[in-house]
């Protein structure tokens, strides 16, 4: 199934500018997984395995990449689900968290990919501002660019990942060629967390 991530373009190699502003020789866009039912199921099962080690009352998806995964996980695990907007909306209820109420509850924050940790830190702040506690953050992929360390340092919350980029890269190695493998490995080696 790992090779399917490359086949459908969920993992791409080349020259990319990330939303964080960083330049990268690879790009991960797990939204394309949503159009592949078998692969989507496989990804959800990996999330479930990681979440099974966490005690939580509610699942909170990070907009936008974490929302579809959090939705399915909430349904499958029979947990209330909500999501965090980038910022509180300026109309209606003015809430930043939609869906499940987090007040007095332990939340598992779910996102797809972690780079710098900025989006996840925003979600943690929103959960806490709404009276909730964060039991942990679960991502499918930690790019290995110090985001998990930033979340731990700044918020005191541990990030659990299905894959770290180095692990994913190792599994993809036979499918992407040695030159591409080395290029990404060299890029990742600059991040000392």
Swiss-Prot record:
Pathway: Pyrimidine metabolism; UMP biosynthesis via de novo pathway; UMP from orotate: step 1/2. Its EC number is 2.4.2.10. Orotate binds at residues 115, 143. Keywords: Glycosyltransferase, Magnesium, Pyrimidine biosynthesis, Transferase. Its cofactor is Mg(2+). The keyword Nucleus does not apply. NCBIfam families: pyrE. Catalyzes the transfer of a ribosyl phosphate group from 5-phosphoribose 1-diphosphate to orotate, leading to the formation of orotidine monophosphate (OMP). This is Orotate phosphoribosyltransferase. It comes from Pyrobaculum aerophilum (strain ATCC 51768 / DSM 7523 / JCM 9630 / CIP 104966 / NBRC 100827 / IM2). The lineage of its organism: Archaea, Thermoproteota, Thermoprotei, Thermoproteales, Thermoproteaceae.
């Amino acid at each position: 199934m790992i090779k399917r991530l490359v086949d459908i373009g969920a993992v791409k190699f080349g020259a990319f500018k990330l939303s964080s502003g960083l330049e990268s020789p690879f790009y991960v866009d797990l939204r394309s997984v949503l159009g592949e039912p078998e692969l989507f199921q496989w990804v959800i099962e990996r999330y479930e395995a990681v979440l099974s080690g966490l005690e939580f009352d509610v699942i909170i998806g990070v907009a936008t990449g974490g929302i579809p995964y959090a939705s399915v996980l909430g349904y499958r695990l029979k947990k209330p689900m909500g999501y965090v907007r980038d910022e509180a909306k300026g109309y209606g209820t003015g809430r930043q968290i939609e869906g499940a109420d987090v007040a007095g509850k332990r939340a598992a924050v779910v996102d797809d990919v972690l780079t710098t940790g900025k989006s996840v830190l925003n979600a943690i702040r929103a959960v806490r501002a709404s009276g909730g506690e964060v039991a942990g953050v679960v991502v499918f992929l930690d790019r290995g660019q110090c985001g998990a360390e930033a979340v731990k340092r700044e918020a005191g919350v541990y990030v659990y990942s299905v894959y770290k980029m180095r692990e994913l890269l190792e599994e993809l190695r036979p499918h992407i060629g040695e030159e591409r493998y080395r290029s990404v490995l060299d890029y990742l080696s600059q991040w000392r967390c």
